[in-house]
UniProtKB/Swiss-Prot annotation:
PANTHER family listed in its UniProt record: RIBOSOMAL RNA LARGE SUBUNIT METHYLTRANSFERASE K/L, RIBOSOMAL RNA LARGE SUBUNIT METHYLTRANSFERASE K_L
Entries under InterPro entries matching the protein: DNA_methylase_N6_adenine_CS, RlmKL-like_Mtase, RlmKL-like_Mtase_CS, RlmL_1st, SAM-dependent_MTases_sf, THUMP_dom
Family as reported in the entry's similarity comment: Belongs to the methyltransferase superfamily.
Protein name: Putative RNA methyltransferase slr0064
Keyword tags: Methyltransferase, Transferase
Keyword Transferase belongs to the record: yes
Native species: Synechocystis sp. (strain ATCC 27184 / PCC 6803 / Kazusa)
SMART domains registered for this protein in UniProt: THUMP (SM00981)
Amino acid sequence: MPDTSAFSATTRPYFATVARGLEAIAAQELTELGAEQVKPEFAGVAFIGDRALLYRINLWSRLIYRVLMPMATVKAFNAQDLYRSIKKIDWDEYFSPEQTLQINCTGKNPQLNHSHFTALQVKNAIVDQQRDRYQRRSSVDLEQPDIVINAHIHQNHCQLSLDSTGFSLHRRGYRPALGNAPLKETLASALLTMAGWTPELPLYDPLCGSGTFLLEAGLQSLNIAPGKFQPGFCFQQWPDFDQDLWHSLLQTAKAGERDTLQAPLWGSDGDREVIQAAKSNAQQCQLGGKIHWQKLNFADIEPPAAEGVLICNPPYGKRIGQEEALGDFYQQIGDVLKQRFRGWTAFVFSGNKALTKRIGLRTSARFPVNNGGLPCTLLKYELY
């Protein structure tokens, strides 16, 4: 059995990875979950906390991808340097040869400029140490590894971290049925936060696709921990895993769930199959029968209440559909909002400035957001 001395500190530093542009609101969420010394950095947030906090963040965070536990920074001038440095670490403290392994590598320097090659050096150093000691070694598993190690190359050093999460938290596990170019769940939650939506406000997505905005809103409204849908977390394979603590956090989360939404949620889309997918996704996450779904073309939508928040993610020509064909549709979005949704606040998320100009309404706020490498903007319209 690995010894647990590497995990013995009461509180320790962690790093949560997050989409670029979402660092500040992720830092706010982590603070609300109990993190201390919270510091937004590039594409992530550094913080400190105890084991209970680590578990709680994996269970409850709606915005981050994963939580890394930094374990060592070693010399990495070139491949030989990195191999020697990695092999000096006592890997017995972290896992045993019976456990499966995956190495994820980011960053580069002039000598280590290919992430797959760098990951191979890290893996070779670890399994060679195991073979020298035990005549057996951890197998690599790229699908469902027990242990995931993150190696980040910066200048002539490599920062090594244990990944506590495993499957990225944006893959909630509730969404087997996808529409075209779906939003990541973490991004949908972040956009709802930016929009100032809270569970007591009615919400309508007239271009709902597979339902991501509404599913994330529903989970918030019912106080359901998004992490409960994950198949498992890597920290459960760590030598210091506290089963009783984890069970207690799960029980507390379950006890705090609500049965009814605090305000109505509506979703419509012109594609019947997509609406069926959204209903199926809702069923997977305790939201079956709680959200109003309707097959409806955008031109035919009407406000389902006197006031509320409307949010949508129309196609913007980069991935689905061609830009030229979308200009008229964006103009229609503006016309429908202006003529029918007085008293509402609308948000349109798009990655195409030329198209959003066709909406023809004055924005009251703009929030820049990165979506899978595409610079996008969340546009706010106060409809009077």
